[in-house]
Amino acid sequence: MKTSELRQKFLKFFETKGHTVVRSSSLVPHDDPTLLFTNAGMNQFKDVFLGFDKRPYSRATTAQKCVRAGGKHNDLENVGYTARHHTFFEMMGNFSFGDYFKRDAIHFAWEFLTSPEWLNIPKDKLLATVYAEDDEAYNIWLNEIGMPSERIVRIGDNKGAKYVSDNFWQMGDTGPCGPCSEIFYDHGEEIWGGIPGSPEEDGDRWIEIWNCVFMQFNRDEQGNMNPLPKPSVDTGMGLERMAAVMQHVHSNYEIDLFQDLLKAVARETGAAFSMDEPSLKVIADHIRSCSFLIADGVLPSNEGRGYVLRRIIRRAVRHGYKLGQSKPFFHKLVADLVKEMGGAYPELKEKQAQIEEALKNEESRFAQTLETGMALLENALAKGGKTLDGEIIFKLYDTYGFPYDLTADICRERNIELDEAGFEREMEAQRARARAAQSFKANAQLPYDGQDTEFKGYSERQTESKVLALYKDGEQVNELNEGDSGAVVIDFTPFYAESGGQVGDVGYIFSSENRFEVRDTQKIKAAVFGQFGVQTSGRLKVGDSVTAKVDDEIRNANMRNHSATHLMHKALRDVLGGHVEQKGSLVTAESTRFDISHPQAVTAEEIAEVERRVNEAVLANVAVNAAIMSMEDAQKTGAMMLFGEKYGEEVRVLQMGGFSTELCGGTHVSRTGDIGLFKIISEGGIAAGVRRIEAITGLNALKWAQEQERLVKDIIAETKAQTEKDVLAKIQAGAAHAKALEKELAKAKAELAVHAGAKLLDDAKDLGAAKLVAAQIEADAAALREIVTDLTGKSDNAVILLAAVNDGKVSLCAGVSKPLTGKVKAGDLVKFAAEQVGGKGGGRPDLAQAGGTDAGKLPEMLVSVESWLCQKLS
């Protein structure tokens, strides 16, 4: 049975059982910021199980795309080396939302697996596990299914705590949870391994093929299991594992889907086809996850999901290199994947060209540094030793684009350990250099006396240019070699240099022989732009003809935020008053930060009105026009100008319909609608009369809104509120209750401490004229005071010093019986003690308190009190 046929059979079976076939959700869980990628069939129904969402059906079945790479669920390092680990897999599932429960779930699974009409798997090849306390599921298997008792395994709390078990599922520390029953398939006696729960359970003989989760409890904060009014079912059957069963093979990579992909990998890499070659399996697996991620909108980048994708692509390319393929090949496998899976997932075919282009671009980018990076690594490994130096790991990462786990992958093949601590030191040093980067930016005053730069970036993102000057370590040089950090000056540039609050562009300067990664652009002189970065491959020389290309994604984000800043500036003046003036700004791809003159905090109502006005302008989608004109003509337009700013005879006026007119030399969107969405995320004071506002736009604003929505839903669930309106009342009631409990707890602690203090007095050291108690106990500052007061009141000649440590801080309390205060004062004692533990304090002759910071000095200080007291008494 082919994998595609098995997928269809599963969905058809459950459709005949009254289930609605629901399309796979995206690999990017847009409604759940807690997840990096969709990794289970139930992810898209999470809100249904939690009661936040209601569907028009109570039974559902899906074939869900899943990715496990990065984050908590990360199978990346095992992929290619085991029979069943994948970065991408399909999870078949059937779900009941308060409809059927254990009996039907188990019967459905059994019928699909064993019925001659469906899979017809021999019954004696199957085994079931149940949670040890789930007699209901056990009896269904035994009495209704007819499974022999020796093939029903009870699994208890085998993970170290109550309800922490392979056979007990929970969504989190609180919330829906319940026992589960797993079905295992026996691959035969010739395969090593034992049944679940046995010492040999990790072998490959008995493989889990289906898991039925029975959500029947709601776990509260106290750990109580409260029965759900409508129990639900969440099941999962791994498609690749089941295909291996149906095709009578022992590895997922032997199934038809992977066999065709493996042959395609061998074809494109020129390698011999062999099931013993891990690199073939790595690439076959990775083309699936990479293609599906790109189809769902993820693109290679240096952060978040995009960086996980980049790591997977580069791991695949490296394994191709290992097989002898140094030319781009990975993108050519997309067509083979579309042939295999495009029928079930039409988005693959619809976006085939986009997937191929994204993979080819990333592959080509990495190919330029892969060979030199591998040479560096091979040289380092050839020197011998059991550990690869952290400095080498960092250079591979920083200069050659090797993700840490890619280097780890290579070293694992050679049984070489990684100097992780050394790598982290280098990373921290880089972060420190970044913080000090201003010393190598615009104000570096690099020596230059050549021609000016002609900026083409308003209309062009790519230019053909000539290298006019090169810099390394602040000095002019004739060439930059691979790995060198420096600056490049070219005659025509598309790169915007940092100015007017907008950060400099990034991108690449390259030719067929070399590549320079532009990480910042600054003005060396008023009309001379310096592109700062790293020579990642080849040698760049003065006079070279090169192509200069801006990073489109980052430029577009900068433009959205800059244009939004203009609209916000106008809206702030309209809402707050004409006194508002710009005091500073920072426009980056992530956000816009805007400082204004305003005497008090901007209210929530004022912020909402500013947001409304800006988004109104965005929705109007008016054209954004720029014109060069004389200062006199610019003033006639009513354009806003910054007080104290120096302008030339000619200025650039930026106009956004009737919404904003302002002088600006920055890069901007073509129409206001390109901004997408505008949201202010923070407001606060940074100096007297100056407020700072931070805002985001586009997809960043959408993501922020979704995260806030998710947070509200989580709060509703956590507080068990019925609606959003009830949340505040619930929180206030909870806070009041907690405060009352804290008071009761403090009172109880004080009473206990007083009782414990009585024994301290019994054990006091008798110095003749006084009885001394100097001890460390467990109590807070208030309890210390109560104990000391109680003890000094019970004796005519007691000198008490008690210490406690809470949250790393020292609390001290000294007390002296009143008849003794003529000779010994509590204030003097506590001052003496506090100085030794890094603190100070004082108080009355009979009672004094202090604090300290050095808890390590407590034992020594407590010993010294006796000699101090003896001197006072003598």
Swiss-Prot record:
Keyword flag Metal-binding: yes
EC number from the UniProt entry: 6.1.1.7
A Pfam family the protein falls into: DHHA1
GO BP annotations, alphabetical order: alanyl-tRNA aminoacylation; negative regulation of DNA-templated transcription
Cofactor annotation: Zn(2+)
Annotated binding of Zn(2+), by residue: 562, 566, 664, 668
Cofactor: how and how many bound: Binds 1 zinc ion per subunit.
Swiss-Prot/TrEMBL keywords: Aminoacyl-tRNA synthetase, ATP-binding, Cytoplasm, Ligase, Metal-binding, Nucleotide-binding, Protein biosynthesis, RNA-binding, tRNA-binding, Zinc
Catalytic reactions of this protein: tRNA(Ala) + L-alanine + ATP = L-alanyl-tRNA(Ala) + AMP + diphosphate
Domain of life: Bacteria
Gene Ontology terms, MF aspect: alanine-tRNA ligase activity; aminoacyl-tRNA deacylase activity; ATP binding; tRNA binding; zinc ion binding
PROSITE patterns per UniProt: AA_TRNA_LIGASE_II_ALA (PS50860)
One GO term describing the cellular component: cytosol
Places the protein is found: Cytoplasm
NCBIfam families, A to Z: alaS
Protein family per UniProt: Belongs to the class-II aminoacyl-tRNA synthetase family.
Domain notes: Consists of three domains; the N-terminal catalytic domain, the editing domain and the C-terminal C-Ala domain. The editing domain removes incorrectly charged amino acids, while the C-Ala domain, along with tRNA(Ala), serves as a bridge to cooperatively bring together the editing and aminoacylation centers thus stimulating deacylation of misacylated tRNAs.
Its job: Catalyzes the attachment of alanine to tRNA(Ala) in a two-step reaction: alanine is first activated by ATP to form Ala-AMP and then transferred to the acceptor end of tRNA(Ala). Also edits incorrectly charged Ser-tRNA(Ala) and Gly-tRNA(Ala) via its editing domain.
UniProt protein name: Alanine--tRNA ligase
